[in-house]
Amino acid sequence: MAATAAALAVTDELALPLRAVGDLAAAAGFSREEVVVITQCASLGGKLPFDDASVGSVLAVIKKVENLGDLFITEISRVLKAGGMVLIQSSPSDQDPNNSIQRKLLLGGFVDVQASAASSQDSEHSVTIKAKKVSWSMGSSFPLKKATKGLPKIQIDDDSELIDEDSLLTEDDLKKPELPVVGDCEVGATRKACKNCTCGRAEAEEKVEKLNLTSEQINNPQSACGNCGLGDAFRCGTCPYRGLPAFKPGEKIALPGNFLAADL
């Protein structure tokens, strides 16, 4: 048996009418002499003696629908070339087998499945179901075109009013701040603040004066009761040294650097 064929006609009967072979040849665009005919296909056990993808078109004239099983549909798909056509002619019955045959073809991977009246004058084969094998082969691949999504365009309204930030500033805001001169007092040996003091020395001297201490009391502290140098816990209520750290009589009192700072 030939391993390839332009067209193949199979039937489960003993013979196949010539006009059925002619219909297949005309539909597939071949001459009748190019069609290979196989009768009693049920005896083949669902196998066809052809190579894979070696037949251009297949005509199956099936009298008994049970002979057109899933295995036989798969075998037809195997021997058909990509894009090949299959025509199935079956006898009408009360159970309407057309829908079941169409369903088998769809499940077998065929496309464009259509049912129509047969052109043959044989009343026993009056229904023809036409289908087509997909145009791509098993295992073939092709690139997919990915849709490129561009960034959304921002619509800028040129008519919108923009506020100039500089217009929100006043003349006073634009002036540079004048920093006070540090240590502008012309102090001498006594280190006293000048009349127009702006460095903060005058305020510091005012805080010292509030303690009611003279410079002699700070430089040479003395205690009449003997408890002034021991600290506030031992000083009387009128002690001029209240609030100062403990000291030794005759020793100069050293005030801490933050002593005159205001308590927060």
Curated annotation (Swiss-Prot):
Gene3D superfamilies: Vaccinia Virus protein VP39 (3.40.50.150)
Region (Fe-S binding site A): 185-199
Chief location of this protein within or outside the cell: cytoplasm
Top-level taxonomy: Eukaryota, Viridiplantae, Streptophyta, Embryophyta, Tracheophyta
Motif, Cx2C motif 2: chain positions: 236-239
Domain of life: Eukaryota
Function in brief: Component of the cytosolic iron-sulfur (Fe-S) protein assembly (CIA) machinery. Required for the maturation of extramitochondrial Fe-S proteins. Part of an electron transfer chain functioning in an early step of cytosolic Fe-S biogenesis, facilitating the de novo assembly of a [4Fe-4S] cluster on the cytosolic Fe-S scaffold complex. Electrons are transferred from NADPH via a FAD- and FMN-containing diflavin oxidoreductase.
Organism name: Oryza sativa subsp. japonica
Self-association and partners: Monomer.
Reported cofactor(s): [2Fe-2S] cluster; [4Fe-4S] cluster
Annotated region (N-terminal SAM-like domain), positions in chain: 1-142
Motif mapping: Cx2C motif 1: 225-228
Gene Ontology MF: a single term: 4 iron, 4 sulfur cluster binding
Protein name: Anamorsin homolog 2
PANTHER family for the chain: ANAMORSIN
InterPro entries, sorted: Anamorsin, CIAPIN1, SAM-dependent_MTases_sf
Binding site for [2Fe-2S] cluster: 185, 194, 197, 199
GO cellular component: cytoplasm; mitochondrial intermembrane space
Biological processes, Gene Ontology terms: iron-sulfur cluster assembly
